[in-house]
Amino acid sequence: MENGFSLVPKEEEEEEDYSNEKSEDQTSYYLSTEMMKKVSFMAAPMVAVAASQYLLQVISIVMAGHLDELSLSAVAIATSLTNVTGFSLIFGLAGALETLCGQAFGAGQFRNISAYTYGSMLCLLLVCFPISLLWVFMDKLLELFHQDPLISQLACRYSIWLIPALFGYSVLQSMTRFFQSQGLVLPLFLSSLGALFFHVPFSWLLVYKLRFGIVGAALSIGFSYWLNVGLLWAFMRDSALYRKNWNLRAQEIFLSMKQFITLAIPTAMMTCLEWWSFELLILMSGLLPNSKLETSVLSICLTMSSLHYVIVNAIGAAASTHVSNKLGAGNPKAARSAANSAIFLGMIDAAIVSISLYSYRRNWAYIFSNESEVADYVTQITPFLCLSIGVDSFLAVLSGVARGTGWQHIGAYANIGSYYLVGIPVGSILCFVVKLRGKGLWIGILVGSTLQTIVLALVTFFTNWEQEVAKARDRVIEMIPQEII
């Protein structure tokens, strides 16, 4: 396929592009129309990629929900717990590649990209084993929280059959970052849509026609993740970067694993601590007097917030890619311009989504529930939800900038302080002491998100971008064999 059409650019073209990157016009120090176009063009297909991967589990829940109420409850609980204990952790750990691969690509060190990706796959696959062991005993964990024994057994069964999906997801996230760090979103877009289109009929076939029930719902997710991996592997093999730089030595792989783990732990903390705080919100709502109403309303608000986060997180991914590429290329002004352009786009997203949601605050809740009591309660919380969505728009973009520069440790500390030392305690007081119920819990999360956004915004504003270029250079040099240096 050397002379044929390829979805993956050849290495020679990549080298030429990034050698020219260093000599580009650097007058657009704060905002650049051209940079906003680049971020937008990358973010748009990344929305489809993230949404496609997100919908796989949603579709399986819908399929299980049409079996019976018991199956729906078991799959919903299992999905929540497997996300908290497994998928969120894998997603967070893989985020370290956004720093490592992105800066290596900007510096033209393509061999490093292969080493980091391979090292990431090995690390994440190893992490899957203890997670799988936990899932095998999921019923015992649920019984500790006084869940119904029958629901616990079904949830455990679903979790066990979801283990192949966990391993597929770990490889998929590494490969996703491999392409994302190079700005190659078309392979991601096509493979994700292909997996989604396969998943719908295949899940229906396993669940209903072959009568596998919830086991079929779990297996279909695993098949779809591995299909996505296979499609991306086909695209990767067509890349000159793969053919020339995949024959790695053991020393390179172990060195890449060391660097990966150093960044992966704080990256996972950034992602997981925020993710877990929202799950804790739902658990705390179950302690309220009218727990069914409170949990339903907060679940609806959380679903809407999660759907929005899929969009704005794509802008954060684009910001991460462009910032890391520019730092690796030794271009501090372009890196700052990329960060500012992404933040500006996040501001536009915050305004559009918040205003739209507030304008239809009396109607949108009926998408999720026909109960007027639920819809009225959602209407009361919507102003706080709009504020939360506005803050999340900035937070997702700033988190992307943090991953692109390698500030994950700052984000992790900010998460602990913002959510667990301030946000959740404030929410608990407002909920149980001031008697604001679910509204108080959501205000607490909003306070935590706002504090974290302020911290990351201040760090970004006062950043010495020339110093960040030097750090990126040191990180890249650490992976270059000594005999070459």
From Swiss-Prot:
Compartment list: Membrane
Residue spans crossing the bilayer: 41-61, 74-94, 118-138, 159-179, 188-208, 212-232, 263-283, 297-317, 338-358, 381-401, 414-434, 442-462
Region span, Disordered: 1-26
GO cellular component, one term: membrane
A GO molecular-function annotation: xenobiotic transmembrane transporter activity
Xref: InterPro entries: MATE_euk, MATE_fam
One Pfam short name: MatE
Membrane topology recorded in Swiss-Prot or TrEMBL: Multi-pass membrane protein
Highest taxon of the lineage: Eukaryota
Family: Belongs to the multi antimicrobial extrusion (MATE) (TC 2.A.66.1) family.
Name recorded for this polypeptide: Protein DETOXIFICATION 8
Naturally occurring in which organism (per UniProt): Arabidopsis thaliana
Gene: DTX8
